[in-house]
């Protein structure tokens, strides 16, 4: 667990803009998080509605992604729980 937490920390510190492998489990957690975030933002915008497409990563090739922004800290616990 400590190793995985350290890897997530390193990914956030040095991974932004670099290509990395994203496991299907972690990808699903991130997708769910950003979808909920998108829905919350859309529901609060009554007049000006913008399309939110940024999931925090961009697929470069199958299974490999470019991290566009750090993984949210509240997701670290969720990710660690899936690896128990």
Q: Where is each model-derived feature located?
A:
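Short, amphipathic alpha-helical interaction segments positioned at domain boundaries
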Residues: 71-84
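A short, conserved structural fragment
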Residues: 53-63
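Charge-rich, solvent-exposed alpha-helical interaction surfaces
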Residues: 6, 25-29, 48, 78
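Short acidic, hydrophobic short linear motifs in intrinsically disordered regions
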Residues: 15-36
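Alpha-helix N-cap and coil->helix boundary residues
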Residues: 20-21, 40, 44, 60
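Short amphipathic alpha-helical interaction segments
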Residues: 37-54
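Positively charged, polyanion-binding regions of nucleic-acid-associated proteins
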Residues: 1-17
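Minor-groove-contacting beta-hairpin "wing" of winged helix-turn-helix DNA-binding domains
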Residues: 63-70
